[in-house]
């Protein structure tokens, strides 16, 4: 199964956004 690099980046950005929300 080939993963779309953009999909990986989006998922990481979503994770980063959640982490920043928790940190605030």
Curated annotation (Swiss-Prot):
Keyword NAD carried by entry: yes
Molecular function (Gene Ontology), one example: glutamate dehydrogenase (NADP+) activity
Predominant cellular place of this UniProt entry's protein: cytoplasm
Entry keywords, A to Z: Cytoplasm, NAD, NADP, Oxidoreductase
Record's subcellular location: Cytoplasm
Uppermost EC category: oxidoreductase
Listed EC numbers: 1.4.1.3
Catalytic activity: L-glutamate + NAD(+) + H2O = 2-oxoglutarate + NH4(+) + NADH + H(+); L-glutamate + NADP(+) + H2O = 2-oxoglutarate + NH4(+) + NADPH + H(+)
Cellular component aspect of the GO annotation: cytoplasm
Quaternary organization: Homohexamer.
Stated family: Belongs to the Glu/Leu/Phe/Val dehydrogenases family.
Protein name: Glutamate dehydrogenase
Native organism: Pyrococcus woesei
Gene: gdhA
